[in-house]
Swiss-Prot record:
Biological classification of the source: Bacteria, Bacillati, Mycoplasmatota, Mycoplasmoidales, Metamycoplasmataceae
Organism: Mesomycoplasma hyopneumoniae (strain J / ATCC 25934 / NCTC 10110) (Mycoplasma hyopneumoniae)
Assembly notes: Monomer.
InterPro entries from the UniProt entry: aa-tRNA-synth_I_CS, Arg-tRNA-ligase, Arg-tRNA-synth_N, Arg-tRNA-synth_N_sf, ArgRS_core, DALR_anticod-bd, Rossmann-like_a/b/a_fold, tRNAsynth_Ia_anticodon-bd
UniProt cross-references to HAMAP family, sorted A to Z: Arg_tRNA_synth
Protein name: Arginine--tRNA ligase
């Protein structure tokens, strides 16, 4: 309805040759002044040299002449327009939801999107920071696909450079400690996951490398490849335990092996040489300063391979319309330089970067600290032992990606209406139980008049708006908030309405069915089970 009203107003302005900025046209949900209200006449009266009340009245007359299923339109000084939906429209909404079922809320946007997320270094287990990026990426991909887009989910494996050298040195040292005293490198990773990896290595190779040295290239190669493989397998297992999937795992080292880094940089404009290093003039395109691509010793920087990686994605067979990268907030310094690099070849419009904030984990009022360097990392494996997958996905996604998440393990595990996820699943289970023991007669005319019914139906219709909004601003938490509001409205309706035995029973059961459908559709987008019973 909101969309219909907006389109009708825009059509009116254009037919009357009046000035309107569509981006400033706002149709708001109203509690006290009809179902929707707008100040469109106030905003554009001066530009069109018309009295705002007169303009509002003219808009009213035009919209009432169109088939918008409005019961009435009221004007309030100095020019507000209040819209009241026809009771027939509420019945139409419920019928539409039931008819469309799992397809209610879908769009057909038809964009091809490359979505890169998680992309954790294969140097240990996934921790809570990685978890947030994983959940955000997976849910966003679900919603983008639900909206009719084609989404290619990609994980970029950072398996090249100094962090891999540190991994090899750390695992090799822990492996040697199985046989004898052996000093750790100064920059060693200290987590228990490194000890675990060394033990895995021992299970495969026994004492084969007891007297070996990393100075031996073959020994280094085996420790490098096997350590990466062991951790990458665990990363994939953790993601699978959260029902998070990818279409491809792309390797940074593979870009170098196939010389794609070199080839992509060879065609890059705005490159120059200074102090025996090769630089990219990113300062010309919004970056704070120019960036080094190749150091004076001939070593490529991480930035150079990252540029090549983005070019490879853009020029892949998938041919995405745009890219979305989901990075931790600690990557903020890379945003301007990456966008500047794409601007050098006029590709800036193809990249959106979301920076998500940290996760703080609380249990019994105490916060867990996370530091891989100090061996105190709290991992996804640890969390899955305390709360289930559904709770993790809900509580990690319930805040905007650019806000801190405080994850309360106690609340997440609580079987109580204080737990927002339990409350939502409880509403779905209530609806399911009622419908399982009742029959809806599809031929009967639906009728809704009570205020708690019409409010609930209006909330159901908002599901479409929420889905579309998330495809534009990527704030998946809007879905959590919406489902909680819908569940609260339904629970109140259920508790305060006599449904079975009511003379309007068929309509109320149909409304319950519509609620069940929307809750299930929303939970599915979050990757959460819609429980039939609790």
């Amino acid at each position: 309805m909101k969309k219909k009203i907006s389109q009708a107003i825009i059509k009116f302005f254009k037919n009357e040759n009046l000035i309107i900025d569509e981006s400033k046209l706002i149709i708001e949900k109203s509690k006290n002044f009809g179902d929707y209200s707008s100040n469109v006449a106030l905003i554009f009266a001066k530009q069109n040299k018309i009295d705002s009340l007169k303009l509002a009245q003219t808009i009213k007359n035009q919209l009432l002449s169109e088939n918008l299923n409005l019961e009435k339109i009221e004007i309030a000084p100095p020019g507000f327009i209040n819209f009241f939906i026809s009771k027939n429209e509420y019945a139409n909404i419920v019928s539409e939801i039931i008819q469309k079922g799992e397809n209610f809320g879908r769009y057909s946007l038809q964009k091809k999107i490359n979505l890169e997320f998680v992309s954790a270094n294969p140097t240990g287990f996934l921790h809570l920071g990685h978890l947030r990026g994983a959940v955000i990426g997976d849910i966003l991909a679900n919603i983008l696909e639900f909206s009719g887009n084609f989404v290619f989910r990609e994980y970029y494996i950072n398996d090249f450079g100094s962090q891999i050298d540190r991994l090899v040195g750390s695992v090799f040292s822990r492996y040697q400690q199985i046989f004898k005293k052996f000093a750790l490198p100064e920059e060693a990773y200290l987590g228990e996951d490194i000890i675990w990896c060394a033990q895995k290595f021992f299970q495969i190779y026994a004492n084969k490398f007891e007297n070996s040295s990393l100075d031996d290239l073959e020994t280094y190669k085996i420790f490098r490849e096997k350590s990466i493989e062991i951790f990458l397998d665990e990363i994939k297992a953790d993601l699978a335990n959260l029902s998070i999937k990818f279409d491809v795992f792309s390797s940074e080292s593979e870009l170098f092996r196939t010389e794609k880094v070199q080839k992509n940089l060879a065609n890059l404009p705005f490159v120059y040489k200074k102090e025996e290093a090769i630089w990219l003039k990113t300062s010309k395109f919004g970056d704070q300063k120019d960036r080094v691509l190749v150091k004076k010793n001939g070593e490529f920087t991480y930035f150079s391979s990252d540029i090549a990686y983005h070019f490879e994605k853009i020029n892949s067979n998938f041919k995405p319309d745009f890219l979305i990268n989901i990075w931790g907030a600690d990557h903020i310094g890379y945003v301007d330089r990456m966008k500047a690099a794409l601007k050098t070849v006029n590709l800036n419009q193809k990249l959106d970067i979301l920076l998500y904030q940290l996760v703080k984990l609380f249990k019994n009022g105490q916060e867990f600290k996370m530091s891989k360097r100090m061996g105190k990392t709290f991992t996804i494996k640890d969390l899955l032992e305390l709360v289930d997958q559904d709770a993790i996905r809900y509580f990690i996604s319930e805040r905007s990606y650019n806000s801190l998440v405080e994850f309360d393990i106690g609340l997440a595990a609580k079987i109580s209406l204080q737990n927002p996820l339990f409350l939502i699943q409880y509403a779905h289970a209530r609806a399911s139980k009622l419908l399982a023991n009742s029959t809806i007669v599809p031929e009967k005319i639906l009728k809704f008049e009570a205020e708690n019914e019409t409010i609930l139906i209006s909330k159901l219709k908002q599901f479409e708006e929420i889905v579309l909004k998330i495809t534009k601003n990527y704030k998946i938490n809007l879905l959590n908030k919406y489902l909680l509001e819908l569940a609260n409205l339904f629970n109140s309706f259920y508790s305060n309405s006599k449904i079975i035995g009511n003379q309007n029973q068929n309509s109320l059961l149909s409304l319950t069915k519509a609620v069940q459908i929307v809750l299930k559709n929303g939970l599915k987008l979050l990757g959460i089970k819609a429980k039939e019973r609790i």
